């Protein structure tokens, strides 16, 4: 099943994507089925409490960025406000230098869990989606940390939907294209740690909540993007994530929303 997150007449809900619209999965709302796409606002597939990203989970990628190959899963956090959906623009901030794409398979947590074994992971995962761990590479090298270089708004495109029927992640082609040219061509079979091993390791550190997003690492072939480009992340049996790249606008942007 391909699941999307939508807004309809003030309600936000998950729905099953069909040829003629979206079937609401929250039957308590009592909505007609299916709802035509033209009547819906398509939202990013998740609004996570946190985004956890695997680091150096492909041997060749670790080599290309000059990091040692880890002997156990390593991971870092990415700001939840970085999430955007398919079709929304990646905004490149002024003065950050080189900005790179990183195509990745991502998992969406379905149940609250902690301290779970690798074998128990599938029962706690809602589904899978495509992700792009956009990274300000010059800042990464300068800071030696990942918070700033990966935390900008729009630096975590995900989508176009959540695939819930994927039973095996062991051999999936992962491709990233920029302006139609293939830049990354990898396979999940080359991961150092499987998605189940990665999720289990994360769960031993922090409680995972429904909707949390886990990125499983990027294969070799990272490279720069710039305003005017189009980036596509394509994962076999999962989907195709498409985002244009634009320059971030000048000036302050804020809304007067009081603390609740």
Question: Residue ranges of each PLM-predicted region?
Answer:
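N-terminal accessory regions of nucleic-acid-interacting proteins
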Residues: 114-128
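Residues embedded in well-ordered beta-strands
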Residues: 104-108, 129, 175
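Short coil/turn connectors at secondary-structure junctions
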Residues: 47-49, 70-72, 79, 95-96, ...
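Short catalytic-site patches enriched in acidic/histidine residues
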Residues: 77-91, 113-114, 154-160, 215, ...
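Short, conserved beta-strand element in jelly-roll/cupin
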Residues: 76, 106-111, 199-200
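Extended, compositionally biased flexible segments
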Residues: 2-94, 101, 260
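Catalytic-pocket segment enriched in acidic/His residues
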Residues: 18, 38-44, 61, 69, ...
């Amino acid at each position: 099943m391909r699941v999307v997150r939508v807004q309809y007449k003030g309600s936000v809900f998950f729905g099953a994507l069909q040829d003629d619209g979206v079937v609401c999965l929250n039957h308590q709302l009592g909505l007609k089925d299916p709802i035509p796409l033209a009547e819906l606002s398509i939202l990013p597939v998740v609004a996570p409490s946190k985004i956890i990203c695997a680091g150096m989970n492909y041997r060749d990628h670790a080599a290309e960025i000059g990091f040692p190959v880890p002997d156990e899963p390593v991971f870092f956090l990415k700001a939840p406000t970085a999430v955007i959906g398919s079709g929304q623009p990646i905004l490149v901030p002024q003065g950050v230098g080189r900005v790179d794409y990183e195509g990745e398979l991502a998992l969406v947590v379905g149940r609250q869990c902690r301290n779970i074994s690798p074998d128990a992971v599938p029962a706690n995962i809602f589904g899978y989606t495509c992700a792009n761990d956009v990274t300000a590479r010059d800042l990464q090298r300068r800071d030696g940390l990942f918070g700033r270089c990966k935390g900008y708004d729009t630096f975590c495109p995900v989508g176009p939907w959540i695939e819930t029927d994927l039973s095996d992640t062991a051999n999936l082609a992962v491709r990233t294209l920029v302006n139609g040219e293939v830049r990354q061509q990898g396979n999940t079979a080359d991961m150092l740690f499987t998605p189940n091993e990665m999720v289990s390791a994360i769960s031993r550190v922090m409680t995972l909540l429904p909707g949390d997003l886990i990125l499983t690492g990027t294969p070799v072939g990272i490279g720069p993007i710039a305003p005017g480009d189009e980036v596509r992340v394509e994962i076999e049996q999962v989907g195709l994530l498409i985002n244009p790249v634009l320059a971030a606008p000048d000036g302050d942007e804020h809304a007067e929303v009081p603390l609740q």
